[in-house]
Design a protein with these regions (language model features):
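Short phosphate-binding/catalytic loops that engage adenosine nucleotides
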Residues: 78, 87, 104, 126
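Conserved catalytic-core motifs of GNAT/GCN5-like acyltransferases
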Residues: 108-110, 122, 127-144
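Acetyl-CoA-dependent GNAT
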Residues: 2-5, 9-83, 92-94, 98, ...
Length: 150
């Protein structure tokens, strides 16, 4: 990559490409396509994409929790060929700024204990709150992480 990808808020025309990134990165464990459209309707400023030369390379999705002081990083995905250039970090920081602008004080996320992305999360200041067994069903354990914003 000669020039850095542009980070921007997702558009309706990005929905299929976002879903394809999800399938490419997560395989069978993906959100249904309609979820991204609904997320865009709920939190338009928190669904970001990374784009280079008209191609989407990744996305990040933030959302609001039931506790209005708490937000979530619901999903983060970068295509394998676009990894190693800091896209995930850039997108996470922009989602965090979007949450902060909405008055959110804390952001949480869950991550598979075997996912190497957790190194990024800890480096960005996330702290482990718990390890929850079977979070998404049998054998789907997750670490619950949180970061204070601001």
């Amino acid at each position: 990559m000669h020039q850095p990808p542009v980070l921007r808020v997702a558009r309706h025309t990005d929905m299929h490409a976002i879903w394809q990134i999800d399938v490419n990165v997560f395989g069978e464990d993906v959100y249904p396509g309609f979820f991204f459209r609904q997320a865009m309707d709920l939190w338009p400023e928190l669904l970001l994409v990374a784009e280079l030369d008209g191609k989407l390379l990744g996305y990040a999705l933030g959302g609001l929790g039931q506790d209005r002081s708490q937000g979530w990083l619901l999903s983060l995905a970068v295509l394998p060929e676009a990894r190693g250039f800091g896209l995930a970090e850039r997108m996470m920081l922009q989602v965090e700024q979007g949450l902060l602008a909405l008055g959110i004080e804390r952001v949480r996320l869950t991550v598979d204990p075997a996912n190497p992305a957790q190194r990024l999360y800890f480096r960005l200041g996330y702290q482990q709150l718990a390890e929850e067994r079977d979070y998404f069903g049998p054998g789907e354990d997750r670490l619950l992480l949180e970061k204070r914003l601001g």
